[in-house]
Amino acid sequence: MEFVNLYIQSEYTLLSSTVKLNNDFGKILSQDAITSCAICDTNSMYGAIKFYNLCKAHNIKPIIGLKLNLKNNYSYDNNVLLYAKDNTGYVNLMKLSSYAKTNKVVTIEDLSKYSQGVLCILPASESEACKLFLSGKYDSFTKEYNKYKMFEDLYIGLDLQGVSKHSEIEEFYSKKTMFNFSFVGLHRVNYMSDEEFDAFKLLRCVDLNSSSYTPINNEEFWGYCHQNELLNEFRKYPELILATKEIANKCNVEIEFGKYKLPKYSNEITDTKKYLHDLCVFGLKRRLEKTGNLDNTNMYLARLNKELNVINKMGFNDYFLIVYDFIKWSKKNGILVGPGRGSGPSSLACYCLGITEIDPIKYDLLFERFLSEERITMPDIDTDFPDNKRDEVIKYVFNRYGAMKVAHISTFGTYGPKGALRDIARVKKIPDLFINELLKIVNNFSSIKDVEENDMFIRLINENSNLKEAVKLAKIIEGIPRNISTHAAGVIMTEEDLVNYTPLQPGMNGLYQTQYEASDLEKLGLLKMDFLGIRNLSIIEEVIEEIKRNENIVIDVNKIPLDDKKTFELISRGETEGIFQFESGGMRNVLTKYKPDNILHLAYVNALYRPGPMEMIPEFIECKFGRKNVSYLHDDLKEILAPTYGVIVFQEQIMLIAQKFAGYTLGEADILRRAVSKKKKEVLERERIKFVEKSGLLGYDSKVSNHIYDYIVKFANYGFNKSHAVVYSILGYQMAYLKTHYYKYFMANMMSSGINSVNLMRQYISSCKKHGIATLPPSINYSTNRFETYKRKNRSGQEVDVIYYPLIGINNVGGVIVKDILEERMGNGLFKDFEDFVSRTKKIVNKRVATYLIYSGALDDFGLTRKAMVDKYEEVLMRSDYGILKDQLNEIEYPTEEYAFDEMSNYELDALGLNIKYNFLLKYASVKKKYNCLNISELKVSSRSNILCVIRRLKTIKTKNNDEMAFLELGDGENIVDGVIFPKVYQNIKQILQENEIYVLKGSLEVRNDKKQVIIENAFRL
């Protein structure tokens, strides 16, 4: 006899269960000899697919259930347990869950629409009808109970979880004949052991935002029970046990996996194969005409026809047409589309359709890396859009294909070690002092298990029982979903209504959102498309618009020359601040040494600049400039690896090596590459045997083929997707081109993008200064909500470029206030003077906002001192209330006294987060000159220099030898850099070191782990 558990609530009943749907759970069920069990989460089905597959993997029959909170007609809670008897019932459960998530309140009448194929259990302790029965209100009970008779299979669920449960069962048994009841045994599970009960209560506290949780519904009995315990518990009621098996036998859902359920492009086009072919051929002709490459038409057609044949055989014609359609719509509506992403640019068909912007033949890209008949997977065409236009494209797709066929995808924020400990500390009221010390250690580990061997960790928790308990709880809740959110890019599309494949819930911007995660949806064969919002595309778009507006020049970034000498000179100088993919300090250092002069060079650097391959960069550079000879493991590798100086840089090279040495098709070679990259021993050995055998057929001896195979295995993880490297290098190049030829517009937009980062602001302002462009403080008459470029006359009367700091960048001046100020300025003209400003903005700004506008320099144009404007603001405000009578009042006298320099500097720093006009170091200009001090931005690697700076932060540590040393953050008002003082030097100067004091430091700049730092040799305080 088996008690089939029909009431397991998983971790996906968020913050109400610690039952994890993982392999450990599957093992527990298997060890208990369980043949069937059910998931029954509340209102949602987030975990249904995971549960289904987990059960199948352990030879357990999965029963898909759903607990629904129903609208009550009396004063009792009203819950019902529903189970899918067949696939129709499964779809109906998804519809009911969608309805519950969308409409919040579900009535019994709503159930009737979706009762087919569904079995219903009324749990005695949770059903309103059952509570009416137990209260002796039989007339009311009968009225409610009869409503559920729409279900062919209707049961009363009886449990023994709590006191007085036997008497409840006897009460129901006594009226069994009268009401023709069918009963079934229930045992609710929300945690797996007594140890997990505390974790369960903790999750309830998090959910309820409380520091304590008192069980009121017999929760202390909701733990998992083994079969022998359940059989013993229900031994007096064998019919309740038998009924669980009876229900299990009635529930037979078989979910289909692996078969694609792709949407149709259009019902009006009957022959999508021909339509796609014609579009591609037309697009190819247009591409070749523009590039002057018509002589190679036959070669391109051969490749195109080969690709289209594979696309058609695999049933993806509609997929390509759908992507083509929304890309075409985007371009037609002035939305910049990225040149490509991932492996999609490897397809000539994508290039012909305008989906991507690079010629795969020109760059030797392999279609099989993207799609092949040997690898039965969905093609993955990810598309990049400006982050402020992405939603417009999704809205178009939504409107074109329908609300029930397009949806966002759910994703879950799960507990990591830090998040778990923080929530536990908050609930348990553990002082920050203690938990923060623990978090400092945990911060470097991905799980509690990984950190348990750390000596400091062990000592800390052994010294503090509260921390020890917190860690114990954290281990239990780690990995459990804490909240649901929306996938950053993914959108799901189907031909039929989505609710036939996945339960839904409300999503963003009027779209639905799937309850199933992306991994579950892909297993179901549903089409996921990634619409990525890229800030860099927004910047490019905005720069182009500004150039058009100010210079009347129209730029198409997809038509700019890709061999512009000046652009590559800028890149080779490492002046790539703000350039996508190339802006980090370490990358800029590599660029200055490698000096790329074409797109492929940029792709090489892009591919190599990652942990692992980065180690090969010095040798790569030496080989490029002929300072080191290129060597090959075998002469036959030369034609494949010569372009990359004998180094495997790209995944495609691994595929070509497998083709060359073992006769693999490129599709087979890609499968090999994917297999060996996982480094599983049994896979490696199996693939080695196959590779060596195939290699022998081509005449290579086993010693050579084994060496080549080892070579492939070594670099399988290092290799980068060539098409992705090329397209993202082109995107970076496009930004570099704009920076080279339209510097002021580029920098103004980069500054607008990075306004929330003071460090970036300092870096960009410093860069502009080097190019002769001054960044001016905000101006109430010329600044807007972004950085704006203007022409202004300098002291010599020459017109120069300047960039105004935006009003939105002033602290305490919010977006709504800026909007209202700009509307006032637009409607009624520039502000004439201080009194005009106060009068016209008195309903927009208060004294605090006005003060920060003054501190920032935004009102300097009025010719008054900042101190006078702050002091006289309220008097001017009061005067403005007199309207036309104010002319009869005495004129306001404005004193000429100004704040001291240090005050001005501090006020400006408070208002803007940095100094633009009143850099505190300006007063030390003579000192800077005397000691020949350099700005931080002027420091050269390994060159000893003097720096005039402030110590922003100072932290001392002790070495293993118990010697003191210090780490610092240094600033010169424009840039910041880390500093380090080693023990010997620190002993000599430590008595003069203090935060927020100004010093002349002597030291040399070094680059370690991609970060610059100054090794300080001496210091004196000013």
Give the role of each language-model region:
Residues 62, 66, 82-87, 181, ...:
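Acidic, His- and aromatic-enriched active-site or binding-groove loops in soluble protein domains
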Residues 44, 48-104:
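Hydrophobic or amphipathic alpha-helical targeting/insertion segments
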Residues 53-55, 136-137, 171-173, 198-203, ...:
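Short secondary-structure boundary/capping segments
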Residues 80, 197-277:
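Active-site or pore-adjacent capping/gating segments
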Residues 4, 35-39, 55, 191, ...:
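Noncatalytic, beta-rich nucleic-acid-contacting surfaces in large DNA/RNA-processing enzymes
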Residues 18, 45-60, 197-201, 351-361, ...:
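Glycine-rich loop at the start of a catalytic domain that most often binds anionic cofactors/ligands
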